[in-house]
């Protein structure tokens, strides 16, 4: 005889699956925090007008020196991500629910792993995606102005290097995988992870509504609102070259010369 479905059983089911979901989230150790700063978001998007300004201290002599900084309009719009699964009502009635625990654990693991996937994909795609100055994050022509208000003739600065291969007269760009030098020693990191709403598990489990009524199944879904973007290009250098000590020194030396406006 099928087990009657009661509100108490639905509550117990959700408690168990939420526990599985949380357990799955702990299975995905994060790496993204090493290269991206986490910024909480409370709206549809965040605008990072302060990008381009490097905070620095000077000796306080007389009045404070207040300089009008160039304001940038770089914005990151939050995106909603989801994952949804369905459980057959017959399995619920037949008390055959333990088989779904690994599914909810994997859903939790996927939710926790996604920030890594987003951040490292943004790093890879930085050669084709714009940062705060309007240039691609990895670019050969980042404008650096002589004054902090963005006035004057800009000097073009590159934060990428593409090696040449082949013999003289028949050279071509290196086509192997790129690697990256990142300055992650500061509070501000090269990339931005924007967190609007953390991953949560919800369910549609009323027996006389939705898919339980039309398709004989209960629906469970996880969702989160988040997105990624780019911080200071000065903190990153892309090397399209073999990984050698000479190439490493080239990139490190170039990064030491980077400055902001002014």
What do the PLM-derived regions correspond to, one by one?
Residues 7, 20, 69-70, 205:
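Short alpha-helical segments and helix-capping/turn motifs at coil-helix boundaries
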Residues 23-79:
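Assembly/oligomerization interface modules of large self-assembling protein complexes
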Residues 7, 18, 78, 245-248:
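Alpha-helix initiation and N-capping motif
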Residues 124-140:
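Short, conserved secondary-structure transition motifs
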Residues 2-5, 141-262:
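Sequence/fold signature of self-assembling virion shell proteins
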Residues 74-128, 216-224:
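Long, contiguous amphipathic alpha-helices that act as assembly "spine/axial" helices in icosahedral shell
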């Amino acid at each position: 005889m099928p087990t009657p479905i009661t509100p108490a059983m639905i509550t117990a089911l959700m408690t168990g699956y939420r526990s599985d979901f949380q357990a799955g989230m702990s299975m995905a150790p994060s790496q993204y925090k090493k290269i991206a700063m986490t910024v909480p978001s409370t709206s549809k998007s965040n605008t990072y007008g302060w990008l381009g300004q490097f905070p620095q201290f000077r000796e306080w002599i007389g009045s404070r020196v207040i300089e009008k900084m160039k304001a940038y309009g770089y914005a990151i719009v939050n995106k909603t991500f989801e994952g949804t699964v369905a459980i057959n009502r017959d399995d619920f009635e037949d008390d055959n629910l333990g088989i779904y625990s690994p599914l909810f654990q994997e859903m939790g693991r996927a939710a926790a792993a996604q920030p890594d996937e987003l951040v490292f994909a943004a790093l890879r795609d930085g050669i084709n995606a714009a940062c705060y100055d309007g240039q691609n994050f990895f670019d050969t022509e980042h404008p650096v102005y002589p004054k902090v208000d963005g006035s004057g003739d800009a000097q073009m600065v590159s934060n990428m290097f593409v090696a040449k291969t082949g013999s003289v007269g028949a050279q071509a760009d290196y086509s192997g995988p790129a690697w990256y030098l990142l300055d992650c020693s500061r509070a501000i990191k090269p990339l931005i992870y924007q967190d609007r709403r953390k991953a949560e598990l919800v369910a549609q489990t009323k027996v006389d509504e939705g898919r339980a009524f039309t398709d004989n199944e209960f629906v469970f879904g996880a969702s989160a609102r988040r997105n990624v973007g780019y911080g200071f290009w000065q903190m990153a250098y892309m090397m399209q070259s073999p990984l050698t000590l000479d190439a490493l020194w080239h990139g490190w030396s170039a990064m030491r010369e980077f400055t902001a406006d002014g």
